[in-house]
């Protein structure tokens, strides 16, 4: 497994690779959201059913516009999400119809976050698009908190580890339904 900086890993992602990278609270697994084969590989590594869907992280809301159907949201709903970003808040928003089922699962929505973590932001800026994000762990197990554990648990399963430190969050992000305002998972 390659160990790279956030600026060096772009070609790995562009070629369909799956990476591990530090986020606000835990290590994440990620790939190109427009590459179904990469998403399938990520789901296989994590042993996660496609039906559950995945999260997209971005450095700006503009990067999420190709995926989110903003026409189904009110200005107040968008303003609320923007008031929490960048930061540890994931919003479930209506998804555009062309977005792969492998990414959105069996839902008519997609979970999105504008991250405040500098490495996540660098990754998304270097790709000029969001990154698929899911916690680096096998389904049902605790998320990975150290690069050493990534190297042990995912050595021959992923293509690269992005070097860097986790953020200061103690818990994964809070998840909020953008349409209803309902908190689906408390984080922080």
Swiss-Prot record:
Signal peptide: none
Gene Ontology MF terms in the entry: ATP binding; double-stranded RNA binding; L-threonylcarbamoyladenylate synthase; tRNA binding
This protein's GO CC annotations: cytoplasm
Top-level EC class as recorded in UniProt: transferase
EC number: 2.7.7.87
Main localization (coarse): cytoplasm
Lineage: superkingdom: Bacteria
Catalytic activity: L-threonine + hydrogencarbonate + ATP = L-threonylcarbamoyladenylate + diphosphate + H2O
InterPro entries with a match to the protein in the record: DHBP_synth_RibB-like_a/b_dom (IPR017945), Sua5-like_dom (IPR006070), TC-AMP_synthase (IPR023535), TC-AMP_synthase_SUA5 (IPR050156)
Cell compartment(s), UniProt: Cytoplasm
Keyword list, A-Z: ATP-binding, Cytoplasm, Nucleotide-binding, Nucleotidyltransferase, Transferase, tRNA processing
Domain YrdC-like: 3-188
GO BP: any one term: tRNA threonylcarbamoyladenosine modification
Family statement: Belongs to the SUA5 family. TsaC subfamily.
Function: Required for the formation of a threonylcarbamoyl group on adenosine at position 37 (t(6)A37) in tRNAs that read codons beginning with adenine. Catalyzes the conversion of L-threonine, HCO(3)(-)/CO(2) and ATP to give threonylcarbamoyl-AMP (TC-AMP) as the acyladenylate intermediate, with the release of diphosphate.
Protein name: Threonylcarbamoyl-AMP synthase
Organism whose genome encodes this protein: Shewanella denitrificans (strain OS217 / ATCC BAA-1090 / DSM 15013)
Lineage, highest ranks first: Bacteria, Pseudomonadati, Pseudomonadota, Gammaproteobacteria, Alteromonadales
Gene that this polypeptide is encoded by: tsaC
């Amino acid at each position: 497994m390659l160990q790279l900086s956030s600026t060096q890993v772009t070609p790995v992602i562009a070629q369909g690779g799956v990476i591990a990278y530090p986020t606000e609270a835990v290590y994440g697994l990620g790939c190109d959201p427009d590459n179904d084969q990469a998403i399938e590989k990520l789901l296989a590594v994590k042993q996660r059913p496609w039906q559950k869907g995945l999260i997209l992280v971005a450095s700006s809301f503009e990067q999420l516009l190709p995926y989110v159907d903003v026409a189904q949201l009110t200005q107040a709903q968008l303003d609320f999400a923007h008031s929490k970003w960048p930061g540890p808040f994931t919003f479930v928003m209506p998804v555009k119809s062309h977005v792969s089922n492998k990414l959105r699962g069996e839902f008519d929505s997609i979970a999105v976050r504008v991250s405040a973590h500098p490495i996540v932001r660098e990754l998304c800026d270097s790709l000029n698009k969001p990154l698929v994000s899911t916690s680096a762990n096998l389904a049902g197990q605790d998320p990975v908190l150290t690069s050493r554990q990534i190297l042990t648990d995912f050595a021959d399963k992923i293509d690269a580890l992005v070097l860097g430190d986790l953020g200061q969050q103690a818990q994964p992000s809070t998840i909020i339904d953008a349409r209803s305002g309902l908190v689906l998972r408390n984080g922080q």
